[in-house]
């Protein structure tokens, strides 16, 4: 890649450090008109570095001078005279440093777009409908709920995606979410966790509650529970939230029967949901799903919205969500536990589970009332 410098420019090397421009010009001007004599000097000491460039007006004169003077002695030292070439280092030095930053730059951009952009970008698309339910949570709910449930294959990509996007963010955003929205609820969970190992695991993480949010609108808690559990907890989440998801399926069938769903929900929602319900949680839109059945202190209004959301996943689930999105506390749920009959009637399996529901509502209501 050595290219000749401008025609008529000669490189003179091996100079005596005492030789100066004037001496060079005196020697070379014999062969033709010299346009420029450039003696390379050390910047600090200003002494000759032993080479120079002499430019002739006519390239032919330069060739003659190079032919005649190459190897001749000047000031006691043989000099090397040849057609000057553009210094090879200058090309890389000019081109190189910029390219390395540039090359570094795009990767950063790509990394950014790959990590943040694509995964985050896709998420917004998926996030589309759910955001109504309350801001941040949908990020998770949307992919996890509909997508996860609809396509089992999606699990791996989503989890990977979430890892790509979520692994660090889990540490950052989620804690913040947990702090912002869930701190009371977290305490509620962890505390309840201890005496309610079952629901504690399910609701234990803000992510769970977050995951529960939009689904009322998203299609079904079942889809949602499984997916979120898979996302958040991997294998344990599966079993845990299988605890939840299983409860979901249990919720579906048993809720209709009015039996064990009430059981699981009570043992589950009330003991745990009651304390958390008191705090800020309702204002947390995403948690509305959690509020839907959990924050309701009685756990029955919650199940109301839950059962009806079962019946109409969209209508009452969304109503409840809307109410809590607007920040109105579930007045009925929170203010005073509903009467026993509201509980039994609330569940679809009213007649069958009525007696059991009533007594349980007593027990659950008392517990939720503290």
From Swiss-Prot:
RRM domain ranges (all copies): 8-86
Gene Ontology molecular-function annotations: chromatin binding; mRNA binding; RNA binding; RNA polymerase II cis-regulatory region sequence-specific DNA binding
Residues covered by region (Disordered): 69-370
Pro residues bias: start-end ranges: 127-140
CDD domains reported for this sequence: RRM_RBMX_like
Cellular component aspect of the GO annotation: catalytic step 2 spliceosome; euchromatin; extracellular exosome; nucleus; spliceosomal complex; supraspliceosomal complex
This protein's record includes keyword Membrane: no
Keywords: Developmental protein, mRNA processing, mRNA splicing, Nucleus, Ribonucleoprotein, RNA-binding, Spliceosome, Transcription
Protein name: RNA-binding motif protein, X chromosome
Species, as recorded: Xenopus laevis (African clawed frog)
């Amino acid at each position: 890649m050595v290219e000749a410098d401008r025609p008529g420019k000669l490189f003179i090397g091996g100079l005596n450090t005492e030789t100066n421009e004037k001496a060079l010009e005196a020697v070379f001007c014999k062969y033709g008109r010299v346009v420029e004599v450039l003696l390379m000097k050390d910047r600090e000491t200003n002494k000759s570095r032993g080479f120079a460039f002499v430019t002739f007006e006519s390239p032919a004169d330069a060739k003659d001078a190079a032919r005649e003077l190459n190897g001749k002695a000047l000031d006691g030292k043989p000099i090397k005279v040849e057609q000057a070439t553009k210094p090879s280092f200058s090309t890389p030095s000019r081109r190189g440093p910029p390219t390395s930053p540039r090359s570094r730059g795009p990767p950063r951009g790509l990394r950014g777009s790959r990590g943040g952009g694509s995964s985050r970008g896709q998420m917004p698309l998926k996030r589309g409908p759910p955001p109504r339910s309350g801001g941040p949570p949908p990020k998770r709910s949307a992919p996890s709920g509909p997508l996860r449930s609809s396509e089992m294959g999606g699990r791996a990509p989503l989890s990977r995606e979430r890892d790509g996007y979520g692994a660090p963010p889990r540490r950052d955003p989620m804690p913040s979410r947990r702090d912002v929205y869930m701190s009371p609820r977290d305490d509620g969970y962890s505390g309840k966790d201890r005496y309610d190992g079952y629901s504690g695991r399910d609701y234990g993480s803000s992510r769970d509650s977050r995951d529960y949010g939009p689904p009322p609108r998203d299609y079904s808690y079942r889809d949602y529970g499984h997916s979120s559990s898979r996302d958040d907890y991997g294998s344990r989440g599966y079993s845990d939230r299988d605890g939840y998801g299983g409860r979901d399926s249990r919720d579906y069938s048993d809720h209709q029967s009015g039996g064990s769903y009430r059981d699981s929900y009570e043992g589950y929602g009330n003991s745990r949901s009651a304390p958390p319900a008191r705090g800020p949680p309702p204002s947390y839109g995403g948690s509305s799903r959690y509020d839907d059945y959990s924050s309701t202190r009685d756990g029955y209004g919650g199940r109301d919205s839950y059962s009806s959301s079962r019946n109409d996943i969209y209508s009452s689930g969304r109503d409840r969500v809307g109410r809590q999105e607007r920040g109105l506390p579930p007045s009925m749920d929170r203010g005073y536990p509903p009467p026993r009959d509201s509980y039994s009637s609330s569940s679809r399996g009213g007649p069958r589970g009525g007696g059991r529901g009533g007594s349980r509502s007593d027990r659950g209501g008392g517990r939720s009332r503290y």
